[in-house]
Amino acid sequence: MSAPRTLYDKIWDDHLVDEQADGTCLLYIDRHLVHEVTSPQAFEGLRMSGRKVRAPEKTLAVVDHNVPTSPDRHLGIKNEESRIQVEQLAKNAAEFNVEYYSENDKRQGIVHIIGPEQGFTLPGMTIVCGDSHTSTHGAFGSLAHGIGTSEVEHVLATQTLIQKKAKNMLVQVDGQLPAGVTAKDIVLAIIGEIGTAGGTGYVIEYAGEAIRSLSMEGRMTICNMSIEGGARAGLIAPDEITFEYIKGKPRAPKGEALEQAIAYWKTLKSDEGAHFDRVVKLNAAELPPIVSWGSSPEDVVSVQGIVPNPDEIQDETKRASKWRALEYMGLKPGTPMTDINIDRVFIGSCTNGRIEDLRAVANVVEGKTVASTVNAMIVPGSGLVKEQAEAEGLDKIFKAAGFDWREPGCSMCLAMNDDRLKPGERCASTSNRNFEGRQGFKGRTHLVSPAMAAAAAIAGHFVDIREWN
């Protein structure tokens, strides 16, 4: 009888083509997502070597990072480098026979939102993209992670990837989430617990009652930020919630093929007694709404907490780093988080740009008005999310409250398009990174859930969503 295996072990074993004595492995790749920023050199490499894309049907391309999200984006992209990258992806996709969603296609959106929407992302698959947040797709019980541009070329040419196997980590989140606490708060709490290097060398499996109770949107939020915890990938075993989400998606199996697929997908779970190299446990019932205070995703506290004092940190290097973060963020130790005023609010990104996130925002802001001191924007994660939100009348709620309702794209998550912070501006953001300059030169980012961001937009400062009315 074979030894018990983790979910990661099973997917790895199913895709192992070859293993060398030093542990170097060749893995088969089921799905390859491509965007405009990390693919131009890869396609040029194919062109120069006279190669074709080995499996165009397993490759999907979309523009997301550079595209404007303003209503007039049909007028074109102002920045020359961004425009060239977008134009080049369209040309490369046509030349190499890869399906492509342009900015004028309603299926266009952030790469990690459109994959699941289209049924391109399925349980048990290996999925790669030249983007660190590819871990999002692990919410379906797939092994998904980012790759570099040279690896993008390798996958395009061979449909394989050279890898070494990571270690297994289990993050067990039991208990029931309190009202007002979301998947975003769970993952920020996890990163606060293990640190941004805590997952280095691991693939994380998320399990427990709180994880099981999440929708697919919530699970994608969790897996999306695995990389911020240092992990190679994050995954959640598929279940009935997963199967229901997949049913009816354009590229998902249908009929008997779907039933056969579900029978296989039900085997995709860690065996009882499977070995994890590290286990981390959290009690969801004790989690508060969380706000980041520094320039790392591990710099988090309860919304009812205060800005911490770095002098209480023993490690000299870390202490200096946290003082630098406070200086950059313009904050002082001891400041209550609810006393921090904000200038901007960004709701969107591959972390929190889905329909469930937008519904949560609408519930908070309906009948209210954005503070006069705040500029707030909502960017749907895809054209289909935008279409659904408008069908439900959410856009009317947002506009009536004073939010800017935008076109789909990565937007202000990263300063690679027109949406960015000005120096010194402070933003409540539903995105995944609060690094220095991430949202714009000298911009200050606080990571929060969609509901927390929405409430901050109305109040003009951070508030405890649990006390919101």
From Swiss-Prot:
Amino-acid biosynthesis found in the keyword field: yes
Any one Pfam family match given in the protein's UniProt record, by short name: Aconitase
Sites where the protein binds [4Fe-4S] cluster: C350, C410, C413
Designated gene of the protein: leuC
The family this protein is said to belong to: Belongs to the aconitase/IPM isomerase family. LeuC type 1 subfamily.
UniProt-recorded name of the protein: 3-isopropylmalate dehydratase large subunit
EC supergroup of this enzyme: lyase
Family matches, as CDD domains: IPMI
Reactions accelerated catalytically: (2R,3S)-3-isopropylmalate = (2S)-2-isopropylmalate
HAMAP family named in the record: LeuC_type1
Cofactor(s) the protein requires to work: [4Fe-4S] cluster
PROSITE patterns, A to Z: ACONITASE_1 (PS00450), ACONITASE_2 (PS01244)
Annotated function: Catalyzes the isomerization between 2-isopropylmalate and 3-isopropylmalate, via the formation of 2-isopropylmaleate.
Subunit structure: Heterodimer of LeuC and LeuD.
InterPro entries from the UniProt entry: 3-IsopropMal_deHydase_lsu (IPR004430), Acnase/IPM_dHydase_lsu_aba_1/3 (IPR015931), Acoase/IPM_deHydtase_lsu_aba (IPR001030), Aconitase_4Fe-4S_BS (IPR018136), Aconitase_4Fe-4S_dom (IPR036008), IPM_dehydratase_rel_enz (IPR050067), IPMI_cat (IPR033941)
Pathway(s) this gene product operates in, as recorded in its UniProt entry: Amino-acid biosynthesis; L-leucine biosynthesis; L-leucine from 3-methyl-2-oxobutanoate: step 2/4
Cofactor mode of binding and number, as noted: Binds 1 [4Fe-4S] cluster per subunit.
One of the GO biological process terms: L-leucine biosynthetic process
GO molecular function, one term: 4 iron, 4 sulfur cluster binding
Lineage of producing organism: Bacteria, Pseudomonadati, Pseudomonadota, Alphaproteobacteria, Hyphomicrobiales
Alphabetical keyword list: 4Fe-4S, Amino-acid biosynthesis, Branched-chain amino acid biosynthesis, Iron, Iron-sulfur, Leucine biosynthesis, Lyase, Metal-binding
E.C. no: 4.2.1.33
